[in-house]
Amino acid sequence: MTQVEVKILDDRIGQSIPLPEYATQGSAGMDLRACLDQPLTIEPGQTQLIGTGIAMYIGDPNYAATILPRSGLGHKHGLVLGNLVGLIDSDYQGELKVSCWNRSNQAYTIEPGDRIAQLVILPVVQAQMSIVEEFHETDRGEGGFGHSGRS
């Protein structure tokens, strides 16, 4: 298992607000929670940046973290990430913050400690670009969106 350094920035983390953890053995992501002093209502169409009270340092350039939406919040309440996906580089050491966008027609209130997103650690391959005049021909070629069909 890969070790990731986590710094607690708010004394409530690990006390009244749980640390991120995997819910089950098969969980790919850990829930990130809102580190708020009071409830926060996000009006329709509004975006808010919400702190999690933790900073992390992955340290290994072979890994990165992504912040992804929680499916229930998006499907049931229209609360998704304002930047769609958050990418945390291995050398970042600051607080994890979640951009929450209310795309619904109803206001949504986030309570202190609510689960607002999930954190997934992923392997990274850094590629080196090689300039060429032409590519080796493939069946797909330059066919883009929808080119491979529907079935």
Curated annotation (Swiss-Prot):
Keywords: Hydrolase, Magnesium, Metal-binding, Nucleotide metabolism. The lineage of its organism: Bacteria, Pseudomonadati, Pseudomonadota, Gammaproteobacteria, Alteromonadales. CDD domains: trimeric_dUTPase. It comes from Idiomarina loihiensis (strain ATCC BAA-735 / DSM 15497 / L2-TR). The gene is dut. PANTHER family: DEOXYURIDINE 5'-TRIPHOSPHATE NUCLEOTIDOHYDROLASE. Belongs to the dUTPase family. This is Deoxyuridine 5'-triphosphate nucleotidohydrolase. Gene3D superfamilies: 2.70.40.10. It catalyses: dUTP + H2O = dUMP + diphosphate + H(+). Its cofactor is Mg(2+). Pathway: Pyrimidine metabolism; dUMP biosynthesis; dUMP from dCTP (dUTP route): step 2/2. The keyword Zinc does not apply. Its EC number is 3.6.1.23. This enzyme is involved in nucleotide metabolism: it produces dUMP, the immediate precursor of thymidine nucleotides and it decreases the intracellular concentration of dUTP so that uracil cannot be incorporated into DNA. GO terms for biological process: dUMP biosynthetic process; dUTP catabolic process. GO terms for molecular function: dUTP diphosphatase activity; magnesium ion binding. Substrate binds at residues 70-72, 83, 87-89, 97.
